[in-house]
Amino acid sequence: MGKTLFDKVWNKHVLTGKEGDPQLLYIDLHLIHEVTSPQAFEGLRLQNRQLRRPDLTYATLDHNVPTVDIFNIKDEIANKQITTLQKNAKAFGVHIFDMGSDEQGIVHMVGPETGLTQPGKTIVCGDSHTATHGAFGAIAFGIGTSEVEHVFATQSLWQTKPKNLKIEVNGKLPTGVYAKDIILHLINQHGVDFGTGYALEFSGETIRSLSMEARMTICNMAIEAGAKYGMMAPDETTFEYVKGRPYATNYKYDIDAWRELYTDEDAEFDRVITLDVTDLEPQVTWGTNPEMGVSFNTPFPEIQNVNDERAYNYMGLQPGQKAEDIDLGYVFLGSCTNARLSDLVEASHVVKGNKVHPNITAIVVPGSRTVKIEAEKLGLDKIFKDAGFDWREPGCSMCLGMNPDQVPNGVHCASTSNRNFEGRQGKGARTHLVSPAMAAAAAINGKFVDVRKVVV
């Protein structure tokens, strides 16, 4: 019987352990940031240990970094976390993409941009959205702080192999519909737990037609479907993306092995889901988890359970309303889901020549300094600023309420991020997940509009 892509990569990294039992996996790349690493470093000190492989460990600063004045960190806890990582990186010999560096940015942006993220690797990070890197054909997953320490000390991790779930996506995406809409629709249709216990492999002609940046958007939100892992088979698009990047120094030697990373034709999956995107519409979430979403022209559903009732109360909405009825106050273009160059380009097409609605506060936060530099070379900063957007420095920003960028209590925000939980963007903030183009159109119109009519 053939093997799935996931099984092939997993099996190559097993150090010990029987099939069906927890197995010890070798970790090829460990990415860290300032929030989940301090206690892990302290654990090493208490045990008088060093990092097993500092050369396979890379740090960046992202969650707490201010996006207006990056060196003016007013919050004491945030400042301590940042300075602690800077000191720990120096003490333990870890390369850090520090504040002010041209390579600093959100951890799931930095890995791919530098070429650290490569097909066939096992990649971990103390962050929920590590599956982003699975778009390259890597096994990438988020871990907790105690596991961060375990990888520091041993460069390995005990894991139980999940089942395999194939998501086959076919059809041509309509104009104005994007990768973000694919993953939001899948979660809306199948729930926030359909991937629990599975490794997701996204495949099909639609996936193969996507850019690497669009593929990363889909894998980024695998965790919102309950899955620890999301993967796509690497192909020529992948190889061209990796080629020439600073840390892809063995490209010409590795590419032959990468070409073997695919699911065999006779491989069996434990479950298969199919999706035809030919008639897919732009998606908007109305509630407090990514499952609570609708296609743009679909009314919000009737209350089915206590979770729906609570979500409607929190969001200040009612069944039967539509996305265009939402009274928006903020628009956020950013996060590790949708703050790449192509995302900003898509949004700029909508924004160019227009002005932000007077009722809207709109900010753009490039996901990394690399993206910011490239965007400014293209003049995107001028397009956004001329329209009335705030053009910020890189960081996690308004994706989560851990830094100065927060949505006020009770205000609705069109956001390109990945989570719309209660209080995710600040106390009482009401988050609506959409694609960059949808967010941009909302900023201009002061409400959600059908972006397909804007970008035609």
UniProtKB/Swiss-Prot annotation:
GO MF: 3-isopropylmalate dehydratase activity; 4 iron, 4 sulfur cluster binding; metal ion binding
Subunit organization: Heterodimer of LeuC and LeuD.
Biological process (GO), any one: L-leucine biosynthetic process
Binding site for [4Fe-4S] cluster: C336, C396, C399
PROSITE patterns from the UniProt entry: ACONITASE_1, ACONITASE_2
Pathway(s) the chain acts in: Amino-acid biosynthesis; L-leucine biosynthesis; L-leucine from 3-methyl-2-oxobutanoate: step 2/4
Protein name (record): 3-isopropylmalate dehydratase large subunit
Residues annotated as signal peptide: none
Listed Pfam families: Aconitase
Cofactor binding description: Binds 1 [4Fe-4S] cluster per subunit.
Cofactor(s), names only, from the UniProt record: [4Fe-4S] cluster
Keywords for this protein: 4Fe-4S, Amino-acid biosynthesis, Branched-chain amino acid biosynthesis, Iron, Iron-sulfur, Leucine biosynthesis, Lyase, Metal-binding
Function: Catalyzes the isomerization between 2-isopropylmalate and 3-isopropylmalate, via the formation of 2-isopropylmaleate.
InterPro entries: 3-IsopropMal_deHydase_lsu, Acnase/IPM_dHydase_lsu_aba_1/3, Acoase/IPM_deHydtase_lsu_aba, Aconitase_4Fe-4S_BS, Aconitase_4Fe-4S_dom, IPM_dehydratase_rel_enz, IPMI_cat
Similarity comment: family membership: Belongs to the aconitase/IPM isomerase family. LeuC type 1 subfamily.
Organism of provenance: Staphylococcus saprophyticus subsp. saprophyticus (strain ATCC 15305 / DSM 20229 / NCIMB 8711 / NCTC 7292 / S-41)
Enzyme Commission number: 4.2.1.33
Enzyme class: lyase
Reaction catalysed by this enzyme: (2R,3S)-3-isopropylmalate = (2S)-2-isopropylmalate
